[in-house]
Amino acid sequence: MSRDTIVAQATPIGRGGVGILRVSGPLAQQVAEQVLGKTLTPRMANYLPFKDSDGTVLDQGIALYFKAPNSFTGEDVLELQGHGGQIVMDLLLKRILQIDGIRLARPGEFSEQAFLNDKLDLAQAEAIADLIEASSEQAARSALKSLQGEFSNKINELVDSVIYLRTYVEAAIDFPDEEIDFLADGKIETHLREIIAKLAKVKNEAKQGAILREGMKVVIAGRPNAGKSSLLNTLAGREAAIVTDIAGTTRDVLREHIHIDGMPLHIIDTAGLRDATDEVEKIGIRRAWDEIEQADRILLILDSTENQVELDLVQSEFMAKLPPHIPLTIVRNKADLSGEAEVLDEQNGLAVISLSAKTQKGVDLLRQHLKQSMGYQVCTEGGFLARRRHLEALEQADIHLQAGLIQLTEFYAGELVAEELRIAQHHLSEITGQFTSDDLLGNIFSSFCIGK
């Protein structure tokens, strides 16, 4: 493990009331002696001048020193809390970097040090970035629960259960004359089914956490003048898009970030789909299809005042081009003009909603539908946040536990059961970082802020 001493600004770049520089590593006390002219007592606040190499005072503020291992990173840590002007922060940072053995921290390197020194596991370290980036109160509460170890504790309980079961199975393998009796006595199967049930519950909670963290990408598509931009404005609660009676008004992609009962949604309005001759409009339509192909759900907007035969043709042509794995919802807009009732129905396996973006009648049905389609459940207490890699690891663990159950109940193959349990344990342990590649660590921590 690197024993470098690193420094970075811990507060956001720019002007502020307070600016903080963080130093972590074996030379932290030496930095204090050279910049402050004083050896600091651990965990005691000192109000001191911060000096340049020639003794000129650069700033004055509070200095805090934490002796390893009793710090965030597990290393010696010095924090200098001064005035938040960026020039002042830059001068102080430049001064510290003049000291031999000090270098600028990489993005996320403080959190990486904390992980490598067993102050945080990997899921907790990721929760720091998630807490900073939280886009809603519920997401922030859930990220804090992950940081406090709620997600990690659930994973560790699963890992401990798998290890216990592996020990039992491998003990049976060591006594081949009695192996079948051990495997067939029902205890292993009972324990394995209990683990699978617990994992299913954690998977469901993790899915909710992933929705809270990443949101749902919803693309509004359809022919010109169907009311796509009006629906975007209604969902956004503001005039985000220009709305006119002129077909093709929207020529580029418009994005809005909204929340429905705490669930983040990325709503994307696109250019009307038609055979365009205008070059600018053609570019907009190509961009529309690019967004459609990356969506979590498509809202195909139809003008319910038009002839039904024409609408059926529009829908069939769109579905013929739509990638089959992308969920589709049909929205029959302008119900206030066509006289249709504002309802949510199902036709040929597709959700069909009649509404009026102009009067907003039926729009709440759409909001509820979007929540239900993602399996989102409102939780007033908040759960924990999860990432896509967590969901993938949980899914792989489930696959191998299920495979182990088959090897147990159908073939009584003790060695194969043990191997499936080992692989499941490995995938679960990847979440907290017990088994993690250096490449994965690099990808995770490089996405952090410099000072975290």
Curated annotation (Swiss-Prot):
Residues that hold (6S)-5-formyl-5,6,7,8-tetrahydrofolate according to the record: R22, E79, K119, K452
Gene Ontology BP, a term: tRNA methylation
Binding site residues for GTP: 225-230, 244-250, 269-272, 333-336
Main location: cytoplasm
Keyword Ribonucleoprotein appears in the UniProt entry: no
Name of a matching Pfam family: TrmE_N
Residue ranges occupied by any TrmE-type G domain in the UniProt entry: 215-375
Family indicated by similarity: Belongs to the TRAFAC class TrmE-Era-EngA-EngB-Septin-like GTPase superfamily. TrmE GTPase family.
Name recorded for this polypeptide: tRNA modification GTPase MnmE
Species, as recorded: Histophilus somni (strain 129Pt) (Haemophilus somnus)
Gene responsible for this protein: mnmE
